[in-house]
Amino acid sequence: YTIWQALKDPKVLRLALIYFLWVIGFWGFSFWMPQVLKSLSGWPPSVVAWSIAIPMTAALLVQIYCGYSSEKRNEKRWHVATTLFIGTIGFLATPHSPSPEVSLFFICLTAVGVYGGMGVWWTMPTTFLSGAAAAGAMGLINSSGNMGGWVGPYMLGFINGHTGSFAYGYYVMGACMFLAGLLILTLPKSMEHKED
């Protein structure tokens, strides 16, 4: 399997598209989270700064559990897709939070979604690639994610600037996360295990 074959492989191209969509949500959320929490809660900046530790801690714990559970069950696709679907719920529900505490809860769900499956995700390309092919494919996947990392924050800022609300940007990022989750489930089951 050469590097050129890897870069033309439909599985690699699908992984690149998935990561592009995922990272739109990942960086859009990460970049704007403090401002979104402040606007939804009305809390002073010092409280917002401390509150950010809560969703990040939740995401860390889920990421550790997700990796452990994936390894134990020898399953990857549903572990990653489930976190993305949880993130979708967080993105879609956050703008409708009736109280600061509920908005923080939905932001926790979003954080779990954008961070929770990341460790398991990066084991997927190496189930069918190795050596230079794996390096080239992972470079392509990561580059497409970097493009998503530009789109997400810029898009959310643009939408907020034109509508005065983060809601529509959160809906778009939720849709991106949902589509990424669906695409994960279309990957072949063989990507659950490393090929010999």
Please describe what each predicted stretch is:
Residues 125-135:
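Paired intracellular helix-loop junctions of major facilitator superfamily
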Residues 37-38, 69-71, 155-164:
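Interfacial helix-cap and linker-helix signal at transmembrane-aqueous boundaries
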Residues 59, 84-91, 176-180:
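MFS 12-TM fold signature
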Residues 47, 133-140:
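Cytoplasmic loop-to-transmembrane helix junctions
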Residues 18, 140-144:
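Hydrophobic alpha-helical segments of secondary membrane carriers
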Residues 174-196:
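Multi-pass alpha-helical transporter architecture, strongest
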Residues 74-124:
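C-terminal transmembrane helical hairpin of 12-TM major facilitator-type secondary transporters
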Residues 4-67, 118, 122, 152-153:
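Extracytoplasmic gate region of multi-pass secondary transporters
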